Amino acid sequence: MQSNRRSGKSAGSRMVSCFTRLALLAALAASGASLARADEYRLGVMDKLRVRVAEWQTAEGAVRDWSAVSGDYTVGPSGSLSLPFVGDLPASGKTTSEVAEEIGVKMQKLFGLRDRPSASVEMAQYRPVYLSGEVQTPGEYPYAPNLTVLKAVSLGGGLRRADNGQRFARDYINASGESAVQVAERSRLLIRRARLLAEIGKRDTIPMPEELKNVPDAEKLLDSETALMESRDKRQKRQLDALADLRSLLQSEIEALAKKAETQARQLELATEDRDKVDSLAEKGLALSQRKLSLEQRVADVQASLLDIDTASLKAKQDASKAAQDETNLRNDWDAQLAQELQNTEAELDTLTLKLGTSRDLMTEALLQSADAAQLEEQAAEITYSIIRDKDGKPTEIAADENTPVLPGDVIKVNTALAMR
């Protein structure tokens, strides 16, 4: 009797534990999908990484979270990461995927694990870029993906102002740089809005916004948002599948308990009939009291077993109901998140439109007030850019223009004849 009660409770506990483990593995898988786009980036000194490690233990059917290893780590001057247990791990020149793979392999060998731990490595902070030369504020600046020379110069306040005679020309250059950054950001926001509307409308593809049909590189932005939408869709499906599997397990348990209850009910019926017959014989003095007591005990045991089955069945039904509610909540939360993201994107677009209008007004004013600024197109050849980049451990200077991509650790040199007048 006690054994059956414990088994009922244990089954319910295992179902809840199963759902928790599945949710954790889904989170790690989603994190791994988000890293796929950063795999081509090669790590370097001063890059900061966020490491998370978990291990699926096949024998126990559970997930172990290696919190002692998880955390933020910086690639040191030697080009290595220093992790607990693992020690120094070469990282410079490798991708995040390669580092994650090595962490899993080393931990498996170090601890003699049967299952290889799953490591998730993502960029927490890129190493900075540096501005030098004729920049308003030279120095160190944080790197951001898709950074170009023009955007980097804008971070440094644009070209240096030399005197009042060049003020309007400088205003034009600064406003032009800010406008270029704002136009690029507007394109990203328009594509993001199109992706959110597609997700809300349950569409499989993202239509190109009308405003961007003739914009260069719009297809790249669309491909990036499409990859993100597919990743998010897969994550939601994994979570829903986990809940569906849990409900299926609980339903199977409920059906098994129902069959067991039918069997026990039949046993109770037979035991009751035997007890009644013995009672009748005992009244006539034809049956032993010991046999009567034995049958009474049998009836009581079967009744207790039926009670345990009913309790376990009720618990399984409650868990199934909770899993169904969790599925509904997941869908509702997903829809609410999409609506909130769309609202935030619309607000950012409105703010950016105002900023873009201000930048264009400043450019117009500079052109009207200054002949230097009005002739800036002809004078643009006097502004030169170059990038000093480490190649094979040696600094190499390469020619650049405003649209040249910048990599983490680059030094951007700006030279302009206009600033020397």
From Swiss-Prot:
Location (main, coarse): periplasm
Record bears the keyword Signal: yes
Biological role: Involved in succinoglycan (EPS I) synthesis. Needed for the addition of the first sugar (galactose) to the isoprenoid carrier.
InterPro entries registered for this protein in UniProt: Poly_export, Poly_export_N, Soluble_ligand-bd
Source organism phylogeny: Bacteria, Pseudomonadati, Pseudomonadota, Alphaproteobacteria, Hyphomicrobiales
Family matches, as Gene3D superfamilies: wza like domain
Location within or outside the cell: Periplasm
GO process annotations (BP): polysaccharide biosynthetic process
Region forming the signal peptide: 1-31
Pathway(s) served: Glycan metabolism; exopolysaccharide biosynthesis
GO-annotated cellular components: periplasmic space
The gene coding this protein: exoF
Coiled-coil positions: none
Protein name according to UniProt: Exopolysaccharide production protein ExoF
